[in-house]
Amino acid sequence: MKVRASVKKICRNCKIIKRSGVVRVICVEPKHKQRQG
């Protein structure tokens, strides 16, 4: 899980979702998981 100021899709499997007010990226590749902080 990376905490970033700006979350971006890294590959085509990445999806940007908003979970309880927090922007997240979920992906099949665990390295691509991100959270806005």
Curated annotation (Swiss-Prot):
The keyword Ribosomal protein applies. Pfam families: Ribosomal_L36 (PF00444). GO terms for cellular component: cytoplasm; ribonucleoprotein complex; ribosome. GO terms for molecular function: structural constituent of ribosome. Transmembrane segments: none annotated. Keywords: Ribonucleoprotein, Ribosomal protein. SUPFAM superfamilies: Ribosomal protein L36 (SSF57840). It comes from the Bacteria. Disulfide bonds: none annotated. One of its GO terms (biological process) is translation. The keyword S-adenosyl-L-methionine does not apply. InterPro entries: Ribosomal_bL36, Ribosomal_bL36_sp. Belongs to the bacterial ribosomal protein bL36 family. NCBIfam families: rpmJ_bact. This is Large ribosomal subunit protein bL36. The gene is rpmJ.
